[in-house]
């Protein structure tokens, strides 16, 4: 199994990245192949709502049609990932913009507008989301984090 870690933090050596690296170490010790992607190293944008991914029978059906620094990452996840762990610090009560843009491109393209909803992603993969924030534990509890 291949586990991809997606670091949505601008910092490669701080809390979020350290926790992702530890998760990868644990997975590797159990025999998994691992890879970490630092989103801030990539030149990409969020979804532009071009809807090329929704064109039934089109060359991009189910896949993001945008071509930029995120394209090879999305392709590797689609073709190789058995699991995906995403990590982001909380900035201004939310995930980073880079993580949001990554999720838009990863999740919107394969979704089919049907009842019931379905996905064109080739298989189910295990996922986890890891959040870090610089706030005391009682404040996090108080605000429902």
Where are these regions (language model features)?
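Short, glycine-/small-residue-rich phosphate/pyrophosphate-handling segment
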Residues: 98, 111-145
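N-terminal beta1-alpha1-beta2 submodule of the flavodoxin-like/Rossmannoid cofactor-binding fold
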Residues: 1-111, 115
């Amino acid at each position: 199994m291949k586990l991809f870690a997606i670091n949505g933090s601008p910092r490669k050596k701080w809390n979020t990245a350290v926790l992702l690296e530890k998760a990868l170490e644990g997975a590797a010790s159990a025999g998994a192949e691992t890879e970490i992607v630092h989103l801030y190293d990539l030149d990409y944008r969020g979804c532009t709502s071009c809807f090329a991914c929704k064109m039934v029978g089109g060359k991009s059906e189910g896949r993001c049609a945008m071509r930029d620094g995120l394209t090879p990452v999305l392709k590797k996840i689609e073709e190789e990932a058995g699991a995906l762990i995403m990590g982001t610090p909380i900035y201004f009560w939310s995930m980073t913009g880079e993580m949001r843009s990554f999720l838009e491109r990863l999740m919107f393209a394969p979704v089919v507008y049907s009842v019931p909803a379905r996905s064109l992603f080739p298989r189910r993969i295990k996922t986890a989301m890891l959040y870090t924030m610089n706030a005391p534990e009682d404040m996090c509890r108080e605000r429902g984090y």
